[in-house]
Amino acid sequence: MAARLCCQLDPARDVLCLRPVGAESRGRPLPGPLGALPPASPPAVPSDHGAHLSLRGLPVCAFSSAGPCALRFTSARRMETTVNAHRNLPKVLHKRTLGLSAMSTTDLEAHFKDCVFTEWEELGEEIRLKVFVLGGCRHKLVCSPAPCNFFTSA
């Protein structure tokens, strides 16, 4: 069974943030400039939280009480097929970073929940979950596959 994560879009910096459900800091905005590491604080979850879970592609900061660093992620399979062709996620996110009109925050959150969490939690395809770190996260990935370029998904 996969861990439950809270998925929130930070429109100010146009990044998707993950937080373990139940962490005291859930929903709190990430501090500092993009790429800054969260400040050290007493853990709201045990230090070994997640050690028993099958979480491939999530950086270790995903279990921090301060929440993970800014992340963008998607399902590799969805990127490789025409299922999301009408959304064309990389171009949508790139347009948002340029300040151009694109998918609404609500639509983007729904896309991630539908394409990622349904497959991950219900179908057990967590090995296909990819994490794309575009904002300077300095943490190592847990059981990470080979690095994958966001705009040319492998």
UniProtKB/Swiss-Prot annotation:
InterPro entries: Transactivation_prot_X. One of its GO terms (biological process) is DNA-templated transcription. The keyword Transcription applies. GO terms for cellular component: host cell mitochondrion; host cell nucleus. The keyword Ribosomal protein does not apply. Its main location: host cell. Keywords: Activation of host NF-kappa-B by virus, Activator, Apoptosis, Host cytoplasm, Host G2/M cell cycle arrest by virus, Host mitochondrion, Host nucleus, Host-virus interaction, Modulation of host cell cycle by virus, Transcription, Transcription regulation. It comes from the Viruses. It is found in: Host cytoplasm; Host nucleus; Host mitochondrion. Residues 68-117 are annotated as: Mitochondrial targeting sequence. A fraction may be phosphorylated in insect cells and HepG2 cells, a human hepatoblastoma cell line. Phosphorylated in vitro by host protein kinase C or mitogen-activated protein kinase. N-acetylated in insect cells. HAMAP family: HBV_X. May form homodimer. May interact with host CEBPA, CFLAR, CREB1, DDB1, E4F1, HBXIP, HSPD1/HSP60, NFKBIA, POLR2E and SMAD4. Interacts with host SMC5-SMC6 complex and induces its degradation. Interacts with host TRPC4AP; leading to prevent ubiquitination of TRPC4AP. Interacts with host PLSCR1; this interaction promotes ubiquitination and degradation of HBx and impairs HBx-mediated cell proliferation. Belongs to the orthohepadnavirus protein X family. Multifunctional protein that plays a role in silencing host antiviral defenses and promoting viral transcription. Does not seem to be essential for HBV infection. May be directly involved in development of cirrhosis and liver cancer (hepatocellular carcinoma). Most of cytosolic activities involve modulation of cytosolic calcium. The effect on apoptosis is controversial depending on the cell types in which the studies have been conducted. May induce apoptosis by localizing in mitochondria and causing loss of mitochondrial membrane potential. This is Protein X. It comes from Hepatitis B virus genotype B2 (isolate Indonesia/pIDW420/1988).
